[in-house]
Amino acid sequence: MSKITKIIAREIIDSRGNPTVESEVHLEGGFVGLASSPSGASTGSLEALELRDENKDRFMGKGVEKAVSLINEKISIALKNKNARNQSDIDHIMIDLDGTINKSKLGANAILSVSLAVAKAAAASKRMPLYAHIAEINETPGVFSMPLPMINIINGGKHANNNIDIQEFMIQPISAKTVKESIRIGCEIFHALGELLKEKGMSTTVGDEGGYAPNLKSNEEALNIIQDAIQKTKYKLGQDIRLAIDCAASELYNKNEKKYNLKGENISFSSKEFTHYLEKLSQKYPIVSIEDGQDESDWEGFLYQTHVLGHKIQLVGDDLFVTNKNILKKGIKKGIANSILIKLNQIGTLTETLEAIKTAKQANYGVIISHRSGETEDASIADLSVGTSSGQIKTGSMSRSDRTSKYNQLIRIEENLGTKYAPFHGLREIKSAF
């Protein structure tokens, strides 16, 4: 009942209007799994490689017909009659078939879409939700928790066409007792911010991840506007709401000058100066999480930042670790950061993603499951966060259905499990938040 009978791949459109890969895995008994791959804008140099056609006559070279044909003509043959419930075996067949370190032969976008579709089909064959199947693969059957969301409300950097340098300004509703309540709080603050921007005559257009994308004078102005928006609600900043930022510092770093350049403010910092700039922001505002606060290759800068801030702030490695357990192990050994951002397509298979999560947890590093800026309606990361009890999720703002699809799936899962079987720990999930 769980043998793979056929795999069908197709080219679909992501949230930025770019092509991506969708795979459909069919099993004996009529069970089907459907999954698609997301795509990033600010990417780590060591991420698994997306395969693009490079044909400028189609989709400005971003087509994925080559990846689709590799699934239909190679991966489907290699996986035919294999047991979909053996996720690790399936993923390693694809890894071996690819034969490269960064999945450049078949493409991480091709491999991931199949990997997730296999997991969904296997879950269907066991007549269980995806999150429950993931927990079983993860060797933690029946163990679940609901994640605290990082809700993006202002977009900057590569995620928006504005002059804000920091890529994401997020809120975390720490006083919420359930995921559903945290989502409601996020919606209310999102709308309060929209009204405030209108009052100020500012743009309420949104960026790639659904947060507002106004032109502002500085990163501090973004934090001040968020602070003012929260004051218009019944919630208190610091008590009910804490802040998180994603610097995406690799996008700010000039390797030749060894400087971090905030172009919107016309300021440059050395590595240490940038850490102290972030330290001052965290002293002025209740920031509990900073992601990619240094360039991905500036490990010395990350080590210094961890010494300065790691005991009081969640320091998250995204481009730094690229969901790679081996790179993460090196970071753990050196004492760099204290948390990891998990993105399925950075590594390219569900199995390797689970290995990275396990490695982080064993080292007492925080885990945040994340979307990408180019998303689809696929809500697998919601199930991944619950099935691995990862504690936090970052999946954009309260607009754009490619973002809200994940929040809505969390609401369904929480309703299905109930708080007894899937507790919501809120603030306790944030590393170094006390």
Swiss-Prot record:
Please provide the record's keywords in A-Z order. Answer: Cytoplasm, Glycolysis, Lyase, Magnesium, Metal-binding, Secreted
Query: Pfam families, per this entry?
Result: Enolase_C, Enolase_N
Positions contributing to Mg(2+) binding = D246, E291, D318
UniProt: (2R)-2-phosphoglycerate binding residues = Q167, K343, R372, S373, K394
Look up the coiled coil feature and give its residue ranges. none
Q: In which pathway does it act?
A: Carbohydrate degradation; glycolysis; pyruvate from D-glyceraldehyde 3-phosphate: step 4/5
Q: Where is the active site?
A: E209 (proton donor), K343 (proton acceptor)
Q: What quaternary structure, including any partners, is listed in this protein's UniProt entry?
A: Component of the RNA degradosome, a multiprotein complex involved in RNA processing and mRNA degradation.
The protein, known as: Enolase
Give the organism, scientific name.
Answer: Buchnera aphidicola subsp. Acyrthosiphon pisum (strain Tuc7)
